[in-house]
Curated annotation (Swiss-Prot):
Post-translational modification: 4'-phosphopantetheine is transferred from CoA to a specific serine of apo-ACP by AcpS. This modification is essential for activity because fatty acids are bound in thioester linkage to the sulfhydryl of the prosthetic group.
Principal location listed in the UniProt entry: cytoplasm
Sequence ranges assigned to domain Carrier in this UniProt record: 2-77
Pfam families named among the record's database cross-references: PP-binding
GO MF entry, a single one: acyl binding
SUPFAM superfamilies associated with the record: ACP-like
Pathway info: Lipid metabolism; fatty acid biosynthesis
Residue spans crossing the bilayer: none
Cell membrane among keywords: no
Compartment list: Cytoplasm
InterPro entries, sorted: ACP, ACP-like_sf, PP-bd_ACP
Similarity comment text for this entry: Belongs to the acyl carrier protein (ACP) family.
UniProt organism field: Buchnera aphidicola subsp. Cinara cedri (strain Cc)
Protein name (Swiss-Prot/TrEMBL): Acyl carrier protein
Amino acid sequence: MKNINYRVKKIIAKQFQINIKKISLNNNLKNDLKIDSLDFVELIMLLEEEFNIKLFDIEAEKIKKIKDIIPYIKKKKLKE
């Protein structure tokens, strides 16, 4: 799981030009990282590409923090 956490943080850091050391799994996507709905869609697409999964069933309204995304990725990876 640590590898997944790091990879998610790395993608966010690169895409949104944020120092990875300043990214915590507890960061609120909207309030802390200023990620809007368009950015969120882009983030999901990048995660799908990185992990070679589809996150079409992700419940966007339930995703508030970075750590909320991790279970979706883990669930999809376990199905492989």
